Amino acid sequence: MAPAEVLAYELNKGSAVHARPTSDALTIVARSLVAGALPPAGLVERAVSQVVRRNPLLTARTLVTADGRHLFVRDQLSSSRAVSVSVHDSATSPRLDCTPLLNTSFDTDSGDLLRVIVSRVSRVGGDTEGETAFELVTVMFHGICDAISTRNLHSQLLRRLALLVAAAGGARPSVHAAVLQEPQVGLVIPPPASHYVQATLNKRVHAEPPRPPVDPAPIRAVGRGDVCERGGAAVVAAAAAELPPHSKAIHVRLTAEETRALATACARHATTVHAALGAAALVNADSGTARRVLTSAVDLRRRVGLPESLLCYAVGGFDGSASFEYDTGAAAATADGAWDLARSVRADIVDSIDSGRLLTTYQEGVQGLVQAYRAGQLEGGTFGTVFLSNVGREAYAKELGPLSWREFDYSYGQFLPGGAHYHVTASTFDGVLLLNFLYVCPTISDEAARLFADATVGTLRHMIATPPPPGLTAQ
């Protein structure tokens, strides 16, 4: 359960104080489908334009037109890439009926990021073979829900729609997806129950015998592994030159002794492993300036009534709730400075949690962060973000498995404003700290990523060997 998902859930449940006057694109599109109407052409055009500007595989010119009950999104230079978004309301065609649960505002003019996932659901068999039943459009506002969560939600919708088509017509459905901006991720991260969209067939008037579950055709993207199986080094090199930006990761495992030493050092320095790693990453992220912005995302499990043992803290990018800015010039010079920064990070996060200002700070802090990006304060290099989960929460981490925090696609990192991003995850398993440095290649080169990972780990090891200042009370 990602912090962004829980935050979206709480925003949806929140009081009128946190209510937003406008709905996000996903809500608008869902409501349009429920009403049997087309999503607004202007909304789709803005969303597709956001995607196109950030994806080198798509042409930078798009045209959105409405023709009767069909909405067409066309690449002006290639008619074969046209995507038709249509709504059917005839007696024989199933229609989507869903309960949207994301309700927030977005402002693309201020830098808020929209993405689009389009899937075509068609029947196979009988008189309707090859005929498109409907097309599902998911428009994501990145400020409230990350790309992995949205793709997973989209997949959940597809599975349910496939079951509905099978139950209604008795035909085995086949799901074909045209993903405009990102490949599907292999790892399934179930969203919370509140995010499961409830879909029903409006035309169904009587109960039918239960049918076995139908698995839609998997959506796969050709990756480097598929390329390697087809030929030698020359083929791989040629294919690599043509590959779009793709997610890669560097894994670093500390020894059990180093892990214990780090935890002990953090306690002596009155901070946490989360904050120490965040500080080390900020010190070594080359953004071309001493000004770094670190945003804090807090898992809201205790706010939604889940056991306290499942609580974990996070420091992240736009799936965060509060933004804090630090001058890392002094911290980069000495280990004492890095510990000072770690204490500042911890204090800010704890204050954000315990003061009850979390949601208010989210609404105001992200807007300020977007303005900082637009003002160019973070341009000129690589800006590092850190997402930390489950350190010291091994019982919960083991329920998910050690690979849950390392094997997922981080391709959306190339689209974040302010320059390329690192995504750092940290987990403990059997008393050993596992660090994963995710990045997008070639947006960030392999050499630069390796230098960043080595420097961050080196800073942590140097911090371990530094005694705390006199008079500091351990936490």
Language model regions located:
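Acyl-thioester-dependent acyl-group transfer interface
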Residues: 1-69, 79-80, 86-115, 143, ...
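Hydrophobic/aromatic-lined pockets within catalytic cores
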Residues: 145, 158-166, 267, 281-289, ...
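Short hydrophobic alpha-helical segments that form membrane-spanning helices or hydrophobic packing faces
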Residues: 61-64, 150, 154, 275-282
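Active-site beta-strand termini and strand-to-loop segments that position acidic
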Residues: 74-76, 119-122, 427-429
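Generic recognition of stable, solvent-exposed alpha-helical segments in well-folded globular domains
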Residues: 43, 148-152, 257, 261, ...
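Non-catalytic, low-complexity flexible loops and terminal extensions
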Residues: 2-16, 144-264, 459, 463-475
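Gly/Ser/Thr-rich phosphate-binding loops and adjoining beta-strand/alpha-helix segments
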Residues: 22-43, 110-137, 232-303, 432-436
